[in-house]
Amino acid sequence: MRFNNYAGAQKMIRYFLEEKDIPQALRKRLEIEQEVIGVMGGNEYPFTYDEALEIMTSHLRDFKKEELDHLKEISATDWIYIDGEVHFQRRFYENLIKTRPDYAKRVITENPEDEKQNHINQNLLNDNIHYMKEHGGRTVHTRIRSTIKAKKEFEEVGRKVRVHLPIPKVYEQVSNVEIHASNPEITYVAPFDAPQRTVYFETELKENQEFMVDYSFDYHVNYVELDPAKVSEEQPDFCLEEQTPHIVFIPYLRELRDELAGDEANPIILARRFYDFVTTKVMYSFMREYFTIECIPEYCAINLKGDCGVQALLFITLCRMSGIPARWQSGLYVTKYYTGCHDWAQFYVAPYGWVFADPSFGGSAWREGDKERWNYYFGNLDIFRMPANSEIQKEFMPEKKWLRIDPIDNQRGEFEYEDHGLRFSQLDVSQKLISMEDIEK
């Protein structure tokens, strides 16, 4: 059993960094470990056992201590030891209510708006599915306003700051990207095809300064019905490589892949088996920051839980291990009711080309008994997206000086001073949909 002696670990790391003559590679590794400990031992797991129990008993009818013990034992709540004491993840309660209907029914003060929003979102998705099937595709013109600023206690007025905010990447789905406004003036706009596209600001920070970009783009998706009988004999060999430390073909994932695949060789059938496994066996779960996880697909396959990106990376890895080209896509899910970060996947099968898989949306549909929506998100996507990233672990243009808040992905932006960067807990970030209109394509 690991008791995570973070205080002792920090002392040892400082000793190696300050007193020992160590290789540069080890120095970099230890500096990253310092950041991981800082996140894990700080904002990510803030609640002690007693505090978690108080949250549960004050929010759920007739909640007992034994229930928290059971949830902890079966890993239904995310927790770790910090210096020998149990600490629960910052969204453990929200995660339980989102993923366990039996506990959601026991909420003492229910928020009718939550149920209303969930119903509205399901209707939006289902209406889009029916439109796509009827018309064969859909195009919208979308306009979004994104902002980022340092929280007051982390604001260092007069110092140089370097700030990145994500914007749409131009490729199959996205065209006609236009920046309408910014504040302050943008220093640099990454190329249209940048794997993680951003606008970059460099300036001296003013009091209460908010960095903003207002942009629009056209977004188009086609509806496809994948037929295994129509698969081409020749398939491409791109997007099949490992990408350490996450897209890696470790023995456990190889065994899982072999178990799911059997003797099947048809890429559509194989990809569907991987999609079915992730959507029916992996429970959706809010996650800690990705850079604190050593291998994301392995975490997903072992713990059978994870959020949208964790599920997408397992699907991508299983596909690549099977000779099916697969890649990452991420950015925002945007509607007039809600805007937030989201990740999904693409896979390539000739003659169809690049098609989509959204395991977390598919899994949600499967748990709700909506078979049509479950099937739809194997091969298809909705219109409510802003894709900013086509790959994981890619540098910005220009690169950040300090360790990124999220070295894997970029959906919220990054903020750094000349001598250190800020964490998400030290920032206020927002994305707002200004408009979304259907257009002819």
Q: Where is each model-derived feature located?
A:
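Hydrophobic/aromatic-rich core segments of domains that either
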Residues: 2-3, 23, 310-400
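Acidic low-complexity segments
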Residues: 4, 191-195, 200, 205-302
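Inward-facing hydrophobic residues that define packing positions of alpha-helical scaffold repeats
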Residues: 12-16, 20
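Intrinsically disordered, low-complexity N-terminal segments that are enriched in acidic
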Residues: 29-221
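Terminal peptide-recognition signature
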Residues: 163, 274, 345
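Active-site nucleophilic cysteine motif
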Residues: 267-274, 304-319
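Low-complexity, Gly/Ser/Thr/Pro-rich intrinsically disordered linker/tail segments
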Residues: 379-441
